[in-house]
Amino acid sequence: MDEEYDVIVLGTGLTECILSGIMSVNGKKVLHMDRNPYYGGESSSITPLEELYKRFQLLEGPPESMGRGRDWNVDLIPKFLMANGQLVKMLLYTEVTRYLDFKVVEGSFVYKGGKIYKVPSTETEALASNLMGMFEKRRFRKFLVFVANFDENDPKTFEGVDPQTTSMRDVYRKFDLGQDVIDFTGHALALYRTDDYLDQPCLETVNRIKLYSESLARYGKSPYLYPLYGLGELPQGFARLSAIYGGTYMLNKPVDDIIMENGKVVGVKSEGEVARCKQLICDPSYIPDRVRKAGQVIRIICILSHPIKNTNDANSCQIIIPQNQVNRKSDIYVCMISYAHNVAAQGKYIAIASTTVETTDPEKEVEPALELLEPIDQKFVAISDLYEPIDDGCESQVFCSCSYDATTHFETTCNDIKDIYKRMAGTAFDFENMKRKQNDVFGEAEQ
């Protein structure tokens, strides 16, 4: 370990593993360490099931009705991949897709007046949907046509809207959309967690709705994908990429100290040895004095023996409960997957309800979601602090990732990755940087 590296990475969460992969592909010498004996950090999948019970201090362990412990891979952080989103792009560019198998999530649902409705995925579904009345549908269709044709580089498509100054509230007004449709559009399509976006320039919202539609167009059922064997497969896929390009991995490796000289990182000390480096990437748990708390998320993992009611017996789905429907500031989400994804025993389902904490009784906040899941065989409640770095790391060369937020997709995580890359490399992130180099010394032969 007593060696000189360009970059040392602490923690094998998804953000850290993707950055480690990119740095290795770009010719950097990388050492990647984790104090845990497993990959994934906060974003790991726990197996066998006995391990999950232990982690949540349920000492009696799983009953026999849960089947074989080894058949379970339970995500600690519930997220899906947008089919046309940035993480899929990263997987394709790096060819990490060859280590993973994905399934399309069967449906996306939205909560309205105590019931759940399928988010329409085709024009026919939209016309048949009970989510809105006849005239509302016509106006909504006009709005969707506007979004589909919108091109930020072609003012002819703006229809009198200025993407940089017109607020989204004004765009909704222009198409005369009612409150329910606005809730549905902002939260189930643009996937905002709160209503803060309404008074911001509309460009980002329009682009988010386009991303949803384009992702949906790829597979038809929903815009989301999920990897077989759980999300823990993602960091491992990128760790393989890093290793192929010469990255060194050490799990179960305690970090005793991060060594600084004149305010700059110069190395990491572990078990009496020092590895030197020019730059350091880590998750917040490794540098508690360089991060601040930015809120909390509650996630309740529920094991069920039945599909969720009114989802047409889907073996995977997402449910969004827009905040307006339950008098909150932030949406509540449910991600459900099952034995069909090799993450649970035969006939079992895993539904994870999550939201940003707003009160001193977080469990009560998630109740509307839990009511949709009854009866629940077993619950595991996790309340996590969200951390963000206190500075950009440019001076110390210590670059810290943000905690995983309450969103049900990876777009915010990818933004964090691109942002850290830019601060480390001094140049904007470009997907081309992730391409495997042809015929290089570490390149794998085609399968």
UniProtKB/Swiss-Prot annotation:
Provenance organism: Homo sapiens
GO molecular function, one term: Rab GDP-dissociation inhibitor activity
Tissue specificity field: Brain; predominant in neural and sensory tissues.
Protein name, per record: Rab GDP dissociation inhibitor alpha
CC per GO annotation: axon; cytoplasm; cytosol; endoplasmic reticulum; Golgi apparatus; midbody; myelin sheath; neuronal cell body
Protein location: Cytoplasm; Golgi apparatus, trans-Golgi network
Disulphide-bonded residues: none
Main location (coarse class): cytoplasm
Protein's UniProt keywords contain RNA-binding: no
PANTHER family the UniProt entry points to: RAB GDP DISSOCIATION INHIBITOR ALPHA, RAB GDP-DISSOCIATION INHIBITOR
Pfam hit, one: GDI
